[in-house]
């Protein structure tokens, strides 16, 4: 049996895409995943271009793979994802031993691309944006545990000045409503109990229904919540400007919708938000969160922050810290700004000194970590309903799952509990998890 070695950089969308790559190549070529590159026949790198030095990271990884091909010339090396979409033929110029370059929207063509390389021994590049064809050409979904990701849309049409996603994944395209329902139903039949809906701006979802009507994310959630086997629904990532009243109503009406929201704000300064072209103000962001908390008072809120965007002053950063205090974020993905090639912000002077960026990042992360620890400590003594997803990564002799507010809980239990909803009494708050006992 031939082997596939697959490495993934980046977000949950990339994790979802990587799973589909493995599925489509298993279906077409019988490739089995391996964690040992020494025995692999096909190497795939699914890339992300969001963070700094993304291209350098890709070529470093490819450099580590090159000796495997030199030893075993039949090996095929492919590069997919957003860096592939952004760089295209440049990857072949810098790493001529690469055989396949493909974008996020063309992963369904991997079998044909692989056949072409095997037959002609010539590199191929396919980084087009063929609408939503990708989803129509993939095998039936395959569950791996009680929790699953389901991509409901692709791309982004917001064109924030710092972001490469519209250029690497294309503009927003929503999957047809019935296709999403069918995929979730298939996963349910395989034992999935928790669904996380994915999209670059998932709350911009507009799926065509069979009767010609268009469903938004809130309506999709209502339909999924009506499925008996679904216990919990999550979604990520949202854009504040598209966070609608309908979605707030869904939080009020659907208890299966998890008590957690990730809503990236990026900055607490209106001036910086305008420079980022985020299309909302701090007041508008706060207003949406207040409306949400009116129906879900104890909802957990996480966010993204970019530190040191061009022109960010001490006053701008202080405004961000004030927003963090007011909103009570208990988790964040925060990182130092670095220009992404091809974006409007890359034309701006990167004028915030690196030492200042690092200092601000440390201040922000310390504040949010302190709030997270406070919330975790407040959960000690409470009873929490969790979905048991499998053995704990840190404590393999224990089981693990997540709370409504997205915290990892480890506890002693038997393997048959995996895939079940159980109630745990929290006994201890640890730095990155909770520990408890079955009630």
Swiss-Prot record:
GO terms for biological process: tRNA methylthiolation. Its main location: cytoplasm. It catalyses: N(6)-dimethylallyladenosine(37) in tRNA + (sulfur carrier)-SH + AH2 + 2 S-adenosyl-L-methionine = 2-methylsulfanyl-N(6)-dimethylallyladenosine(37) in tRNA + (sulfur carrier)-H + 5'-deoxyadenosine + L-methionine + A + S-adenosyl-L-homocysteine + 2 H(+). It holds the Pfam family UPF0004. The keyword Metal-binding applies. SUPFAM superfamilies: Radical SAM enzymes (SSF102114). Keywords: 4Fe-4S, Cytoplasm, Iron, Iron-sulfur, Metal-binding, S-adenosyl-L-methionine, Transferase, tRNA processing. The keyword Amino-acid biosynthesis does not apply. GO terms for molecular function: 4 iron, 4 sulfur cluster binding; metal ion binding; N6-isopentenyladenosine methylthiotransferase activity. PROSITE patterns: MTTASE_N, MTTASE_RADICAL, RADICAL_SAM, TRAM. Binds 2 [4Fe-4S] clusters. One cluster is coordinated with 3 cysteines and an exchangeable S-adenosyl-L-methionine. Residues 377-439 form the TRAM domain. It is found in: Cytoplasm. [4Fe-4S] cluster 2 binds at residues 156, 160, 163. InterPro entries: Elp3/MiaA/NifB-like_rSAM, Methylthiotransferase, Methylthiotransferase_CS, Methylthiotransferase_N, Methylthiotransferase_N_sf, MiaB_methiolase, rSAM, rSAM_horseshoe. Its EC number is 2.8.4.3. Residues 2-119 form the MTTase N-terminal domain. Gene3D superfamilies: Methylthiotransferase, N-terminal domain (3.40.50.12160), tm_1862 like domain (3.80.30.20). Residues 142-374 form the Radical SAM core domain. It comes from the Bacteria. Monomer. Catalyzes the methylthiolation of N6-(dimethylallyl)adenosine (i(6)A), leading to the formation of 2-methylthio-N6-(dimethylallyl)adenosine (ms(2)i(6)A) at position 37 in tRNAs that read codons beginning with uridine. Belongs to the methylthiotransferase family. MiaB subfamily. This is tRNA-2-methylthio-N(6)-dimethylallyladenosine synthase.
């Amino acid at each position: 049996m031939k082997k596939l070695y697959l490495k993934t950089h980046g977000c949950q969308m990339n994790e979802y895409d990587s799973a589909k790559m493995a599925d489509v190549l298993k279906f077409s070529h019988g490739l089995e995943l391996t964690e040992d590159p020494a025995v692999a026949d096909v190497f795939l790198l699914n890339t992300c271009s969001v963070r700094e030095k993304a291209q350098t990271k890709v070529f470093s990884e490819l450099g580590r793979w090159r000796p495997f091909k030199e030893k075993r010339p039949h090996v095929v090396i492919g590069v997919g994802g957003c860096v592939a979409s952004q760089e295209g033929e440049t990857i072949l110029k810098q790493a001529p031993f690469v055989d396949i370059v493909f974008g996020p929207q063309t992963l369904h063509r991997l079998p044909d691309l692989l056949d072409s390389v095997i037959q002609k021994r010539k590199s191929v590049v396919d980084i087009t944006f063929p609408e939503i064809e990708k989803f129509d050409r993939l095998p039936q979904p395959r569950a791996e545990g009680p929790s699953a990701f389901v991509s409901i849309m692709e791309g982004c049409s917001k064109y924030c000045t710092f972001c490469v996603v519209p250029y690497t994944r294309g503009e927003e395209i929503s999957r047809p409503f019935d296709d999403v329902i069918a995929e979730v139903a298939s996963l349910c039949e395989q034992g999935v109990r928790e669904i996380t809906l994915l999209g670059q701006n998932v709350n911009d979802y507009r799926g065509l229904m069979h009767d010609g009507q268009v469903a938004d994310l809130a309506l999709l959630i209502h339909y999924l919540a009506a499925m008996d086997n679904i216990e919990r629904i999550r979604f990520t990532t949202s854009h504040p400007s598209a966070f609608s009243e309908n979605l707030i109503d869904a939080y009020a009406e659907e208890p299966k919708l998890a008590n957690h929201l990730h809503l990236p704000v990026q900055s607490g300064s209106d001036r910086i938000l305008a420079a980022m072209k985020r299309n909302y103000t701090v007041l508008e962001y706060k207003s949406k969160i207040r409306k949400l908390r009116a129906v879900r008072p104890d909802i957990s809120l996480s966010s993204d922050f970019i530190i040191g965007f061009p022109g960010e002053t001490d006053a701008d950063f202080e405004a961000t810290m004030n927003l963090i205090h007011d909103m009570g974020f208990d988790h964040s993905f925060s990182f130092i700004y670095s220009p992404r090639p091809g974006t409007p912000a890359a034309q701006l002077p990167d004028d915030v000194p690196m030492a200042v960026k690092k200092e601000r990042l440390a201040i922000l992360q310390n504040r949010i970590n302190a709030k997270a620890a406070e919330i975790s400590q407040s959960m000690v003594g409470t009873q929490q309903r969790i979905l048991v997803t499998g053995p704990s990564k840190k404590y393999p002799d224990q089981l693990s799952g997540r709370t409504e507010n997205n915290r990892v809980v480890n506890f002693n239990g038997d393997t048959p509990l995996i895939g079940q909803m159980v109630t745990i009494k929290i006994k201890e708050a640890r730095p990155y998890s909770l520990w408890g006992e079955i009630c």
